Amino acid sequence: MNDVVPPAAAESAAAGVSRIALGIEYKGSRYRGWQRQEAGVPSVQEALERALSKVAAEPVGVICAGRTDAAVHASGQVVHFDTAVERPLKAWVMGTNANLPADISVTWARVMPAHFHARFSAMARRYRYAIYNDPIRPAHLAEEVTWNHRPLDIGRMREAAQVLVGTHDFTSFRAVQCQAKSPVKTMHHVRLLEHGRLIVLDIRGNAFLHHMVRNIAGVLMTIGAGERPIEWAKEVLEARDRRAGGVTAHPYGLYLVRVEYPGEFELPERYLGPHFLSGLPDIVG
């Protein structure tokens, strides 16, 4: 099956075909992002499709809720695929995991109505960006957090973050190569939380632009370090120019932690993740 490229899942399932949704978590450190790449370049999508194809004994193609970049992680990714093959839900979880590398795991499986779509049915997405704030770099959390040796003032970061809440043109926070049709997005919350030596940016919105969370993290860390005034976040936002936005933060600390769907789909909600933040309270809203 190495030479078979699975077909992409359709917009809606055909007659006689089941639409299956899966919850996925992965450590993105050794992958060139979610999306399937050219032969020989590791991606999360390729590894998952290969494992699912072994369980189904035929090619399987998946669609995800949000494509993550190289070295970005997920504890709450959602995908769907269509298949005429009948397998118990346990097989889609346990059987697929048996064929996946240790840094990718299927967490749940559900049979979905034909109109469910992992990407287009989503109402909101939530990310966490974990910053290890200490003079000494963390060996055990290498590639799982972003290390910032400068003392960060979380109070300044919190105050600056509030200007990002609501509906705005986020052009200043999008990557130059971003292909989104509109830079206007709605952020439901932008919070800074403390967990030991970790500062966690917790951000929930209807949709995100390419590199948007990492660019926001870069601006907030610059303000937290005292290198820019609190008002700089507002200035960057209003500039609507990526050149005003400063540095893009490293990918290692970024996690897609939850994708939210209408209640009719009754999808499970696990812990937000990542695992080392299990003691951090979930703030709803």
Curated annotation (Swiss-Prot):
Record's keyword annotation contains Iron: no
EC numbers on record: 5.4.99.12
Active site positions: 69 (nucleophile)
CDD domains on file: PseudoU_synth_EcTruA
UniProt superkingdom: Bacteria
One GO BP annotation of this record: tRNA pseudouridine synthesis
Major enzyme class: isomerase
Reaction(s) this enzyme catalyzes, per UniProt: uridine(38/39/40) in tRNA = pseudouridine(38/39/40) in tRNA
Binding annotation for substrate: 127
Molecular functions (GO terms): pseudouridine synthase activity; RNA binding; tRNA pseudouridine(38-40) synthase activity
Alphabetical UniProt keywords: Isomerase, tRNA processing
UniProt keyword tRNA processing present: yes
InterPro entries: PsdUridine_synth_cat_dom_sf (IPR020103), PsdUridine_synth_TruA (IPR001406), PsdUridine_synth_TruA_a/b_dom (IPR020097), PsdUridine_synth_TruA_C (IPR020095), TruA/RsuA/RluB/E/F_N (IPR020094)
Gene3D superfamilies: Pseudouridine synthase I, catalytic domain, C-terminal subdomain, Pseudouridine synthase I, catalytic domain, N-terminal subdomain
Role according to the record: Formation of pseudouridine at positions 38, 39 and 40 in the anticodon stem and loop of transfer RNAs.
Subunit architecture: Homodimer.
Family label: Belongs to the tRNA pseudouridine synthase TruA family.
Name the UniProt record assigns to this protein: tRNA pseudouridine synthase A
